[in-house]
Amino acid sequence: MEQPSPVTRQSFDEWIVPTYAPADFIVVRGEGSTLWDQQGKSYIDFAGGIAVNALGHGHPAVRAALIEQADKVWHLGNGYTNEPVLRLAKQLIDATFAEKVFFCNSGAEANEAALKLARKYALDNFANKAGQQGEKNQIVAFRNAFHGRTLFTVSAGGQPKYSQDFAPLPGGIHHGIFNDLASAEHLITDQTCAVIVEPIQGEGGVLPADKEFLHGLRALCDRHNALLIFDEIQTGVGRTGELYAYMHYGVSPDVLTSAKALGGGFPIGAMLTTTKYASALSVGSHGTTFGGNPLACAVAGTVLSLINQPTLLAGVKARHQWFIDELAEINARHNVFAEIRGRGLLIGCVLNAQYAGKSKEIVQAAAQYGLIALIAGPDVVRFAPSLIISPKEIKEGLARLAMGIEQVCQKVTS
């Protein structure tokens, strides 16, 4: 076979639609929580592909599942079912509140399905009913949320910077203030068909929901016959130390969306719900070509079986504390963080006023010393590493972060 021609970071600028601005280096290999670039430089991975690589890179059991299924059948289309999708559905049902699952390819698709389901259920059950004032099709979401990039989900996200250039946007979506129950109560009415919320706002700054807030939303949805949708794209599949974050709060949604870590790096999304609400979607009412394909589901089934173990989930909580302790020491030396927040291995370091707006600069500086991390807006440095990252890798990665922080501090104070 002919050898591929060399590519560089400049190739991206020449050939790829400029929706992203990737780092200057190109990663060519990964193992566990270590990545290597074209020049052979190694990096400790605290980003995890944005909360995707929950078992690190190249986990042997996940790789074996992919290879085994690749030797059988890759794709069939939705005119046929397959064994891996049925097994994965049963795994998710057994592990959660759900009774039915819809599979797709991404978090955005899962949220799109959830919002469509809510409107269809309301149409079927409340349209033109006695006492119903107006159409029951309104959706309540929250400011600074992120639910995907489709026109529907980006409109629900409540961040105009992602949606304002694509007007006219879908109507009937209202945004409340996250963690402000009075704001939500003002918006949720008998015309509301759904409330969609992240248990932790990820892109919005790694901001956990208050327990009282989610319980209040549950009560408001029950009062007004609205579906409560938990977007667990980023928080799901062990990320917070429970299989899904709703389990921390003692409140169950009507619909839950999952993606990212579900495939451990292989694209897959899922919408979980109960039989009552799933019945609103009939044959042909919704679908997606690659949803539930055997390759993705074989991988996801293995990922889920490995993560949904008490020892692993307890390990996520322990690793959270290791991060917190080390970050506190860094902050004692450099005084850059106003707050360190999050759950499990979704952690946000909020920069104080002196370093406001410098999250990207800190992440770029840390990369020079061999750490890959994330931002969650201009003021938050974010970590979402492998759930099985070792204590040694955490300590070394944070030492590299400290070097990057020191570099930025010198610029600020000079």
Curated annotation (Swiss-Prot):
<dbReference type="GO" id="GO:1901607">
    <property type="term" value="P:alpha-amino acid biosynthetic process"/>
</dbReference>
<dbReference type="InterPro" id="IPR004636">
    <property type="entry name" value="AcOrn/SuccOrn_fam"/>
</dbReference>
<comment type="similarity">
    <text>Belongs to the class-III pyridoxal-phosphate-dependent aminotransferase family. AstC subfamily.</text>
</comment>
<feature type="modified residue" description="N6-(pyridoxal phosphate)lysine">
    <location>
        <position position="260"/>
    </location>
</feature>
<dbReference type="GO" id="GO:0019544">
    <property type="term" value="P:arginine catabolic process to glutamate"/>
</dbReference>
<dbReference type="GO" id="GO:0006527">
    <property type="term" value="P:arginine catabolic process"/>
</dbReference>
<dbReference type="InterPro" id="IPR015421">
    <property type="entry name" value="PyrdxlP-dep_Trfase_major"/>
</dbReference>
<dbReference type="InterPro" id="IPR049704">
    <property type="entry name" value="Aminotrans_3_PPA_site"/>
</dbReference>
<keyword id="KW-0663">Pyridoxal phosphate</keyword>
<keyword id="KW-0056">Arginine metabolism</keyword>
<comment type="pathway">
    <text>Amino-acid degradation; L-arginine degradation via AST pathway; L-glutamate and succinate from L-arginine: step 3/5.</text>
</comment>
<dbReference type="Pfam" id="PF00202">
    <property type="entry name" value="Aminotran_3"/>
</dbReference>
<dbReference type="GO" id="GO:0006593">
    <property type="term" value="P:ornithine catabolic process"/>
</dbReference>
<keyword id="KW-0808">Transferase</keyword>
<dbReference type="GO" id="GO:0030170">
    <property type="term" value="F:pyridoxal phosphate binding"/>
</dbReference>
<dbReference type="InterPro" id="IPR026330">
    <property type="entry name" value="SOAT"/>
</dbReference>
<dbReference type="InterPro" id="IPR005814">
    <property type="entry name" value="Aminotrans_3"/>
</dbReference>
<comment type="function">
    <text>Catalyzes the transamination of N(2)-succinylornithine and alpha-ketoglutarate into N(2)-succinylglutamate semialdehyde and glutamate. Can also act as an acetylornithine aminotransferase.</text>
</comment>
<dbReference type="InterPro" id="IPR015424">
    <property type="entry name" value="PyrdxlP-dep_Trfase"/>
</dbReference>
<protein>
    <recommendedName>
        <fullName>Succinylornithine transaminase</fullName>
        <ecNumber>2.6.1.81</ecNumber>
    </recommendedName>
</protein>
<dbReference type="GO" id="GO:0019545">
    <property type="term" value="P:arginine catabolic process to succinate"/>
</dbReference>
<dbReference type="GO" id="GO:0042802">
    <property type="term" value="F:identical protein binding"/>
</dbReference>
<keyword id="KW-0032">Aminotransferase</keyword>
<dbReference type="InterPro" id="IPR017652">
    <property type="entry name" value="Ac/SucOrn_transaminase_bac"/>
</dbReference>
<dbReference type="InterPro" id="IPR050103">
    <property type="entry name" value="Class-III_PLP-dep_AT"/>
</dbReference>
<dbReference type="GO" id="GO:0043825">
    <property type="term" value="F:succinylornithine transaminase activity"/>
</dbReference>
<dbReference type="InterPro" id="IPR015422">
    <property type="entry name" value="PyrdxlP-dep_Trfase_small"/>
</dbReference>
